[in-house]
Amino acid sequence: MRLFGKGRSEGTTVFFATDLHGSEVCFRKFVAAAGFYGADLLVLGGDITGKFVTPIVEDGAGWWAELHGRRIALKAGELEGFEAQMADEGVYTRRMTAAEHAAYEQHPERVDALFLAVMTERLEHWIEYAHERLDGTPIRILTAPGNDDPYEVDDVIRGRGGDRVVLVEGELTEIAPGHQMLSTGWSNHTPWDTHREFDEEALRVHIEEMAARLSDPASAIFNIHVPPYDSTLDTAPQLDEHLAVKTSAGNLLTAPTGSTAVRAAIEAHQPLASLHGHIHEAGGSVRIGRTVAINAGSEYGEGVLRGVLLTVGGGELKRVQATSG
């Protein structure tokens, strides 16, 4: 798949961000980054979608919502502002009557259908927004959904994205002359049993099937959601059997949580750079051999878009720059 645009004499500039988790403001910033940073191509890493739905309930006496276990009273004139705030934080909302809310509590299996409905609405809105804002430009958005993203995400992107928002899961994409990008949003196993998880051997095979088709691994970019194991890009809090954070003497205990298969692939093929996310608090970069491995990090809940600019050309990685805003 060949998707590079005009290119410049100094190379092609890619803007990468990841783990937006449904944040409206972060997606708007992501689309705007093409013009702001002068990028030729936008790459959206995995975990595109939000994590939960907050009902906004009308019970006859007024409106209320539950957030983080706390009930919040809302006036009718405050609803749109609250919904916008929640959208910027990546939270989905749905207005409903008290009877409808009670029905969801009595039939929790219906919540999954509600989640997919509101998730689809936002994703379709994002794709429409990208079409509008990038109209008349050659800028494309390449994306590989992450382990937290339901499979329905792929269908929405295929159905609505056209040539503007392109699904690249499991694909090799030529992002600049002589430079291919290998992409997958699948991860190794997590404590949460999410949608797209492989054991390490299956993930190794998935990556190697793509890597074997690279024209020149040394000039490639790996776009792999989960970071390499024990790289500092994968350092996360340790969890106990109840998924509570472990501490010792008041100090947070951490451990590497990345993928051994991803690390082995980077060590074996030595691409120019590898782009990761997944562990929000482990943003940074490190060298693995000649490869510059990068976790862009994520602060989507605060409305902050963290990203990375890369310029490639002539078989070289000409620039790497972290961004935040």
What do these predicted regions represent?
Residues 109-121, 221-270:
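Active-site-proximal segments of metal-dependent phosphoesterases and phosphodiesterases across multiple
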Residues 11-21, 178-190, 221-225, 292-298, ...:
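Active-site-proximal beta-strand elements of phosphoester/diester hydrolases
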Residues 2-4, 22, 172-177, 194, ...:
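Binuclear metal-dependent phosphoesterase catalytic core
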Residues 2, 25-176:
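Core catalytic region of metal-dependent phosphoesterases/phosphodiesterases
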